[in-house]
């Protein structure tokens, strides 16, 4: 039996594909189109098994469509701006561009080893000025349309990366890249006004029939549409403050009122700005992040004012007003009324400050006389109690709408739809990102950079070891002239998620020098027919891309697309066993050996190793497998076959030596089967030979 020489075969065919430009995109008008795209990679240094799985899935689909007569667009690019390059440049004393280019060369070579059917003529890189000059144009156009604003706001500050994070980039209260505990800081920032499209983004989810339901649900919850009410509270105790308005999704619990809580940035707080106790309290608040998650986990603290709020539905019911760390100015009206019996956050606060807890929703099958709230708030459905004119109403289905009607009738409240989604903060205090095409006059006036002066490129002679933003310290770049007037450049750069919010458009017209895309190309290729990537991007990249399409289409009759991806597939993770030594430190597979077929120990020391569960491959857990080593030893077809066949592509897959060995044997069997078929075809002796070959093939499989 002849052995399959995968190195010879792979080198031969990859050479043929390159010479014949087999995967170059062509457009034949009599054929249907198929745009297949996997989420493009960050050039971190080497490809990993997640890349192998992602791009192999897309490659099989692209090849299948091409064989079925489609015009296929299957491109590749690099999401090449970002903090890791800047950090690596500092550590290795080299420029981020050098580090990035070297990594791109390495990863491109590795991807080619996989034999992917990629049109490399359309390759793009987001750190290339030929790419980001178009992004700067988009920014200016959105600024002209009123979709970009600069405003002061509390932001999520990563103290390690020393940059701002969007809410979506804070995971479990920590920075998505650095892992540092996020702090709250007030800065003047640029924002994309994504909230203008909240309802559109929500409604259009229903039209995405070829998206996973879990992704649509995640976006729906993140957008967070809620029907509530603005309620006006009369205030006692001050000649300066007569009224405070709150937003609530549960106005029906007004008779459970225990306190009012307002944000540290609420206009009322200015009356306490010279109070030492309030100053200390405000400083303490800065240690809390701005995300709902961070606020939920933080200890609830408040500053008690001298103000008293009167319940608008019962003038005899009064409650103290606090300034609290868990209320944000950019949600609702920056003020809430606390009903501790039916909101856990409010209950924690009430217990801490010994405030009243009045139950107003009775759970089903509970005795009204015996029902009490201790340390757990009741947040379920029930019947309204202890609420005078609302008593007996079913909560919340009947009681909310009834309460809103009463408040509107009395002109002390108004029904309102609110969204959880916040405007997208896009300013980042880093060097290695797309420069924002804005300059400032000496008096602070904003001037958009003329489009003829684009791109605004990054200076090459930058000091990355200075504290804070390197661009802020580069005087010859920071201070410049526009129309012979001395101006100061914006030194923040754009969030890298902006770079990836439109790259799929650039692939349609990668060589267009005048604009980011060509309408004729877009009219043929868009939307992407099949997009492939991780579910972790559901409320980041996937939501931002949907917004970006709408932002381009806004007041633009030449752009008709609102959804970038008609089909979405989210692949599972590639997992591997984890190993720890007796001190609890992660150990790699290369550092251990098996003794007596049952015990793992560290090589050399013979220290016992604890085998943990299979987890997603990561450098930090030292459970990665180098794809290039597997390709060099077993061939690209082996790794591709294993990654596709061992588990459904939407599920996690566990890497195993047994599985990859079995895949190698299968490829050998397939090779020999084909050789036998070819040989028997050449020696065809009777008319029934084709039937015999078919039976033989089935038997061999």
How would you describe each model-predicted region?
Residues 1-37, 66-75, 99-108, 210, ...:
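Conserved oxyanion/phosphate-binding beta-strand-loop segments in alpha/beta enzyme cores
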Residues 3, 12, 16-20, 91-246, ...:
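Residue patterns forming the tRNA-binding/recognition surfaces of aminoacyl-tRNA synthetases
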Residues 4, 21-26, 71, 114-119, ...:
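Surface-exposed helix-capping loop/turn segments at secondary-structure junctions
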Residues 14, 194-226, 257, 262-303, ...:
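Amphipathic alpha-helical
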Residues 29-31, 40, 75-84, 123-131, ...:
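Short, solvent-exposed turn/loop segments enriched in Gly/Ser/Thr/Pro and often Arg
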Residues 42-73, 171-176, 280, 331-365, ...:
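Conserved active-site neighborhood of enzyme catalytic/cofactor-binding cores
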Residues 58, 71, 266-363, 376-378:
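Catalytic alpha/beta core of large soluble enzyme barrels
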Residues 282-306, 314-315, 355-363, 389-409, ...:
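Conserved catalytic alpha/beta cores of large enzymes that bind or transform nucleotide phosphates
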């Amino acid at each position: 039996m002849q052995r399959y020489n995968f190195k010879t075969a792979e080198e031969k065919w990859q050479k043929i594909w390159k010479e014949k430009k087999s995967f170059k995109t062509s457009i034949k008008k009599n054929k249907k189109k198929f745009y297949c795209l996997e989420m493009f990679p960050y050039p971190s240094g080497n490809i990993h098994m997640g890349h192998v799985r992602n791009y192999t899935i897309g490659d099989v689909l692209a090849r299948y469509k091409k064989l079925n007569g489609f015009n296929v667009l299957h491109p590749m690019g690099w999401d090449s701006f970002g903090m890791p390059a800047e950090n690596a440049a500092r550590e290795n004393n080299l420029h981020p561009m050098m580090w990035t280019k070297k990594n791109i060369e390495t990863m491109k070579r590795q991807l080619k080893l996989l034999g992917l059917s990629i049109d490399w003529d359309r390759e793009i890189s987001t750190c290339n000025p030929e790419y980001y000059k178009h992004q700067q144009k988009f920014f200016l156009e959105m600024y002209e349309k009123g979709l970009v604003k600069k405003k002061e706001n509390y932001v999520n500050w990563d103290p390690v990366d020393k940059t701002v994070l969007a809410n979506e980039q804070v995971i479990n209260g920590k920075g998505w890249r650095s892992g540092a505990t996020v702090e709250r800081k007030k800065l003047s920032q640029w924002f994309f006004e994504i909230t203008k499209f909240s309802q559109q983004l929500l409604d259009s989810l229903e039209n995405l029939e070829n998206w996973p339901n879990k992704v649509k649900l995640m976006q729906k919850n993140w957008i967070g549409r809620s029907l509530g009410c603005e309620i006006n509270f009369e205030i006692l105790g001050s000649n300066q403050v007569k009224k405070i308005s709150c937003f609530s999704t549960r106005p029906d619990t007004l008779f459970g009122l225990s306190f009012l809580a307002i944000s540290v940035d609420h206009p009322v707080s200015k009356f306490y700005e010279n109070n030492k106790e309030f100053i200390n309290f405000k400083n303490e608040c800065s240690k809390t992040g701005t995300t709902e998650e961070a606020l939920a986990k933080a200890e609830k603290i408040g500053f008690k004012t001298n103000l008293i709020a009167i319940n608008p539905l019962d003038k005899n019911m009064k409650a103290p007003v606090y300034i609290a760390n868990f209320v944000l100015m950019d949600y609702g009206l920056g003020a809430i009324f606390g009903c501790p019996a039916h909101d856990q956050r409010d209950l924690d606060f009430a217990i801490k400050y010994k405030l009243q807890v009045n139950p107003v929703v009775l759970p089903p099958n509970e005795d009204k006389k015996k029902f009490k709230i201790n340390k757990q708030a009741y947040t379920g459905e029930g019947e309204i109690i202890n609420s005078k004119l609302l008593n007996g109403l079913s909560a919340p289905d009947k009681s909310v709408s009834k309460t809103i009607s009463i408040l509107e009738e009395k002109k002390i409240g108004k029904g309102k739809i609110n969204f959880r989604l916040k405007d997208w903060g896009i300013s980042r205090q880093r060097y290695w990102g797309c420069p924002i095409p804005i300059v400032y006059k000496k008096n602070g006036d904003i001037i958009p950079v003329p489009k003829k002066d684009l791109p605004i490129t990054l200076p090459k002679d930058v000091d990355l070891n200075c504290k804070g933003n390197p661009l802020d310290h580069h005087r010859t770049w920071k201070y410049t002239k526009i129309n012979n007037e001395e101006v100061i450049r914006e030194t923040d750069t754009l969030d890298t998620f902006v770079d990836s919010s439109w790259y799929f458009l650039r692939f349609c017209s990668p060589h267009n020098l005048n604009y980011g895309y060509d309408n004729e190309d877009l009219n043929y290729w868009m939307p992407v027919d099949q997009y492939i990537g991780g579910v972790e991007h559901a409320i980041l990249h996937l939501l931002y891309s949907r917004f970006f399409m709408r932002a381009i289409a806004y007041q633009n009759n030449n752009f008709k697309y609102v959804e970038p991806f008609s089909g979405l597939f989210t692949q599972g993770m590639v997992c591997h066993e984890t190993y720890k030594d007796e001190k609890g430190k992660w150990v790699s597979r290369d550092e251990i050996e098996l003794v007596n077929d049952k015990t793992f120990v560290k090589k050399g020391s013979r220290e016992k190793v604890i085998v943990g569960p299979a987890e997603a491959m990561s450098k930090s857990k030292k459970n990665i497998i180098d794809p290039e080593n597997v390709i060099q030893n077993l061939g690209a077809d082996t790794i591709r076959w294993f990654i596709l066949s061992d588990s459904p592509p939407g599920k996690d897959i566990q890497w195993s030596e047994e599985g990859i060995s079995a895949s190698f044997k299968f490829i050998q069997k397939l090779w020999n089967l084909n050789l036998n078929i070819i040989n028997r075809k050449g020696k065809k002796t009777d008319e029934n030979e084709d039937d015999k070959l078919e039976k033989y093939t089935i038997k061999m499989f």
